[in-house]
Structure formats: C-alpha cells, structure tokens
C-alpha cells in the first residue's frame, strides 16, 4: 500500500526513468519540468533502484520485453520503497495507458498511474496519493494539454526535441501506438517556430522535430505541404545550426520534403525511413500502404538530391505469415538499400492489434535464426558504408554521454551532420571541445556502428551551445535517462 509519511523537511527529490522512443524522452523532460515547478529537485544518482522521494517510470508498450522489464524493475522497487518510508512510485506513458486496470493489481506499492494524455496531472496525483494514502489511477482517453505547453527540464543545453504533432492516424496491424497516443493532433507552425526561436535564445543549436508521422503534419489544418514549409522556415532561424526530424512514413513521403531537405542548409543530410519488411505480401498484411518498389524509389530520389545522405531504417522479423521467400525479399531490399544503420526487431505480439490474432505466427526459433541473419547483413553493410567515409572531412558536433568509453580511450565523441557517431582522438595542444562545440575532423577508420578520427581536430569552433552547456555545470544533473525499446539513432539494435 502507498505510504504517505515523509521523513524529512528538505526539498523532495525525484528521478525519471524512461523506456522507449524519442517521444517518451521528450515527455520525460516535461515530467521533470512539472516536478521541479512543484518544488522537487533532481536526485543526482542515475541508478534506477536508488531511492528518491519520487521515482517516475515513463513506459513503452511497443514490445513485450519493455513490459517485462518494467514489471521486473517494479518488483525490485518494492523492497527499496519499503526501506524508505514516504517514497512514492509513479507509472506513466504508453504501458500505463494500456494496463490502466492492472498496474496497481500487479504492483500494489505503486502510488500513481497516469497515461499519455494527462502528463500535466502528475504533481496533483502525487499530492492526492500522499494525502489519501491510496493509489491514484487517472487515465484520459484524449489529450488534455499538448505536451509542449507544459514546463520542461531539458536533458541537453544545446540540443532539444520539439513536438510538431502527437498521435497517429495510420492503422498498421502490428502497432498499438494509435490506441495509446490517440488520433493525430497538429500544432500550428507559428507556435512551433516560436518555441524553436525561444530554445535558440537559450543556447540550443540543434532541434529534432518529433511526430509519429511527420509527413502527415498539416492535414488537420488543411495544408498537405506544411511539413516541407516548416523545414524551410527552420532554415531562416539565426543560430539554429542543425535540424533533424523523426519519423516519416514511406507512404506519405513526398518530393517537396526531399527538396526542402536538399535546399535548406541547416536541415541535416540524414533520414530515418522505416521499411519494416521488404516483402510486398508482408507489407500488405502489415497495412503499410506502400510496397518495396515505392520505398526504393524514395531512397533513389533522396540520394540524387542529397548524395551524402545517411539513411537508417526499422525492420521487423517474424511478422505473422512471413515465409522464407518473404524473408529473402527483405534481405534483398536491405542489400539494395545500403542503410547506414538498421534497427532490427523480432515481431512482438501486442494486445488488441489485428496482427496479434493472425494465424501463422512464426515459430520463435525461426524468428531468431532470421533475426541473426538480418543483423549480420545489416552490420556488414553498415561497416562497408562507414569504411567508405575514410578520408572525408566531416563536421562533428560534440555531445555529452555519446562516447561511453571516452575516458578510457582518451577520445571525445559527437555526431556528424549525417548523424553518424564519430570518436575523435585529440592531438597534444588541441583545445578540448565542450559538448555543443563544433569541430572539423578527417575520418581515419570506419566500424559497423561508428567512425573514428584519430588525426585530431582540423579546427574547432566554440559555440553558443557549448557556452550554454558550460553555464549549466555545477547544477544538479538528472543524468542520462534509461532508454529501452528504441536504441539511439545510429546504433543497430542487437
């Protein structure tokens, strides 16, 4: 049962643990902002199981393993909470929306359950749970407040997420997201651009536009060309160095977006284009509304307009009814597409989806074998593509937390314009770049998941983003969120 006794009079602490996609990471920044506005301070520890006065789990429901890991973690948290009277646990996000009636039944020590549509209610629900000494479960079926209208505590001083829409109008048979995020709701362009300008004024120099399907942005207010126009408008914002977006949908990806990418200098030459399957029959069963020929045509047009574009993708192995022939088609399309990285997943049955009740579910051993073959091919192609970068001069924006072995290898790490991960060795006398600073390097070796520049910096530019990072030092950090379900862009999933 929830415990409503606080044991100290200091400012209460919080930690947010994030599972899933970039949208969840952005939502977690909103959760952190709400809690700080309510008087909480971030707990400096990054260990998920370390005690804090409030621990919030922002969950994912795309795959079954995310469910299992969350409930496993909640099981461990029962003992932690028992040893720390007054501690509160909250579960939000997509899994909370899906399992609203069962979270507290499976984990009765949880204090608050909130969904994807009412993130802003969390502080009130925590207060109510403490006062009433009983769990508070509040799930809304439609959006209460657009997330970007809530306060935020951004994880990065120099890079930011910007939501352009929430929800999805597609009906992919394997996907549970539209049930949990609702129908698409678009923000007006002026509101989005005002937020971006405000972020740039704070030192942000890279933004990622977020939507479940960015290509359909604008349909709600009657402008099918709105996304391309938005990209071009971002090009007119002084101080905005890099613009990225995720995720598009092949069925709605149009040439005006390709032209906007090619003609807007601060829109980066990287594209994440989900394939899901190379088999037309499987795509039909998935209800993906495109076929492999259309997909390959998109890649051809992107590469014609943006020759050095790095293209990544998502692929599902073992969708119901997938035959050896279907899988061979996927392998053929992957070979032809030459992805710089691919996020490969084994099909996971999701409740209340058409695919979940389809006949001909593929046996697990077959799925595993195909998965391993696909990962091997994806890594081989990525390695070839990365080795082709050797000798190129690339611009790198250095980042905090990207190079997990930087201290041991004496390197610094960042992202190239095409979003490839680059590890850089500094020469004696080189200035040490701060996160957010931008340097030019020459690639000396390519590896399946990253590039290396062992020749030091060609030049280094101190940036407003680096200044913003420096100004943050000494503040309590929320640390790097725990992200499960979707890997960092550029790193194939194993």
From Swiss-Prot:
Query: Where's it found, cell-wise?
Result: Cytoplasm
> Under which main EC class is this enzyme filed?
transferase
Residues recorded as binding [4Fe-4S] cluster 1, renumbered to this chain, are: 21, 60, 94
The record's keywords, sorted A to Z, are: 4Fe-4S, Cytoplasm, Iron, Iron-sulfur, Metal-binding, S-adenosyl-L-methionine, Transferase, tRNA processing
Report the cofactors: [4Fe-4S] cluster
Q: Which InterPro entries does the record cross-reference, listed alphabetically?
A: Elp3/MiaA/NifB-like_rSAM, Methylthiotransferase, Methylthiotransferase_CS, Methylthiotransferase_N, Methylthiotransferase_N_sf, MiaB_methiolase, rSAM, rSAM_horseshoe
The annotation note on the cofactor reads:
Binds 2 [4Fe-4S] clusters. One cluster is coordinated with 3 cysteines and an exchangeable S-adenosyl-L-methionine.
**GO CC annotations, alphabetized:** cytosol
Q: Where does [4Fe-4S] cluster 2 bind?
A: 168, 172, 175
Please give the SMART domains that the UniProt record associates with this protein: Elp3
Task: Specify the superkingdom.
Answer: Bacteria
Say where the protein is mainly found. cytoplasm
Q: Where is the MTTase N-terminal domain?
A: 12-131
Q: What is its EC number?
A: 2.8.4.3
Q: Tell me the function of this protein.
A: Catalyzes the methylthiolation of N6-(dimethylallyl)adenosine (i(6)A), leading to the formation of 2-methylthio-N6-(dimethylallyl)adenosine (ms(2)i(6)A) at position 37 in tRNAs that read codons beginning with uridine.
Which family does the entry's similarity section mention? Belongs to the methylthiotransferase family. MiaB subfamily.
What protein is this chain from? tRNA-2-methylthio-N(6)-dimethylallyladenosine synthase
Q: What is the lineage of its organism?
A: Bacteria, Bacillati, Actinomycetota, Actinomycetes, Propionibacteriales
């Amino acid at each position: 049962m929830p415990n409503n006794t606080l044991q100290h009079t200091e400012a209460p602490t919080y930690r947010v643990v994030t599972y899933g996609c970039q949208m969840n990471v952005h939502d977690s920044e909103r959760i952190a902002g709400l809690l700080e506005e309510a008087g909480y301070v971030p707990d400096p520890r990054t260990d998920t199981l370390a005690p804090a006065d409030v621990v919030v789990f922002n969950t994912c429901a795309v795959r079954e393993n995310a469910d299992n890991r969350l409930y496993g973690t909640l099981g461990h948290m029962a003992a932690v909470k028992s040893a720390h009277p007054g501690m509160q646990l909250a579960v939000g996000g997509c899994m909370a929306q899906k399992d609203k009636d069962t979270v507290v039944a499976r984990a009765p020590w949880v204090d608050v359950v909130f969904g994807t549509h009412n993130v802003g209610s969390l502080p009130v629900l925590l207060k109510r749970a403490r006062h009433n000494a009983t769990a508070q479960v509040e799930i809304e079926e439609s959006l209460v407040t657009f997330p970007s209208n809530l306060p935020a505590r951004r994880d990065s001083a120099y890079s930011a997420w910007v939501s352009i829409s929430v929800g999805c109008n597609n009906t992919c048979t394997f996907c549970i997201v539209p049930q949990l995020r609702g129908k698409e709701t678009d923000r007006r362009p002026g509101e989005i651009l005002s937020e971006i300008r405000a972020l740039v004024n704070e030192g942000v120099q890279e933004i990622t536009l977020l939507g479940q399907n960015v290509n359909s942005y604008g349909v709600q207010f009657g402008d099918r060309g709105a996304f391309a126009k938005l990209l071009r408008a971002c090009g007119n914002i002084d101080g905005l160095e890099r613009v990225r977006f995720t995720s598009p949908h092949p069925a709605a990806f149009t040439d005006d977006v390709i032209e906007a990418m090619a003609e807007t200098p601060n829109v980066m030459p990287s594209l994440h284009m989900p394939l899901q399957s190379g088999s037309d029959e499987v795509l039909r069963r998935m209800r993906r509304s495109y076929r492999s020929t259309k997909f390959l045509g998109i890649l051809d047009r992107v590469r014609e307009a943006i020759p050095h574009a790095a293209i990544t993708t998502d692929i599902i192995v073992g969708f119901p009814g997938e035959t050896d022939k279907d899988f061979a088609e996927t392998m053929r399309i992957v070979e032809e597409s030459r992805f710089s990285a691919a996020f490969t997943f084994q099909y996971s049955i999701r409740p209340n989806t058409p695919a979940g009740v389809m006949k001909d579910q593929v046996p697990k051993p077959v799925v595993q074998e195909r998965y391993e073959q696909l990962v091997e091919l994806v890594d081989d192609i990525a390695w070839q593509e990365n080795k082709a970068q050797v000798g190129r001069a690339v611009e790198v924006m250095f980042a905090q937390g990207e190079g997990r072995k930087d201290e041991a290898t004496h390197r610094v790490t960042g992202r190239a314009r095409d979003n490839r991960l680059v590890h850089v060795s500094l020469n004696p006398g080189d200035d040490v770049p701060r996160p957010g600073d931008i340097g030019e390097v020459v690639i000396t070796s390519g590896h399946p998941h990253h590039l290396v520049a062992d020749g030091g910096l060609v030049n280094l530019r101190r940036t407003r983003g680096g200044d913003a990072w420096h100004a943050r030092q000494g503040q309590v950090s929320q640390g790097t969120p725990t992200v499960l379900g979707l890997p960092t862009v550029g790193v194939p999933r194993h």
